[in-house]
């Protein structure tokens, strides 16, 4: 599984449109995603203090768009991610049937995030 952090509003818009398109798809040519081990470092580095975020759990085999594993787009990984880790980048819109779960990304009083609980998914 791979994961993408977004706002509930963006996800609701995706459901209305029939596909999910992050702003980065237009500006960088791909949608940033993470492995489960990368989610918290990414969330706490780039989204600290932001409420109303959700986490999309995505099954790569169900994606219609191309998926590539690449170094972080900024060069060095965020603190907490080992040097050399590759990140999943989706080069196109995310088809909704590839999203297996949508869960709230909990926010602590200090502005840091916590990993949500996922339910098992049988494909």
What are these model-derived regions, one by one?
Residues 1-123:
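Conserved, structured core segments of small domains
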């Amino acid at each position: 599984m791979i994961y993408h952090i977004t706002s509930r509003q963006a996800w609701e818009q995706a459901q209305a449109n029939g596909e999910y398109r992050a702003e980065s798809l237009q500006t960088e040519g791909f949608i940033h995603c993470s492995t489960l081990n990368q989610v918290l470092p990414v969330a706490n580095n780039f989204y600290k203090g932001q409420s109303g975020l959700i986490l999309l759990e995505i099954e790569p085999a169900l994606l219609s768009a191309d998926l590539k594993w690449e170094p972080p787009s900024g060069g060095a990984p965020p603190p907490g991610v080992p040097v050399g880790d590759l990140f999943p980048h989706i080069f196109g819109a995310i088809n909704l049937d590839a999203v297996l779960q949508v869960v709230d990304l909990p926010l602590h009083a200090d502005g840091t995030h916590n990993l949500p609980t996922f339910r098992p998914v049988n494909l």
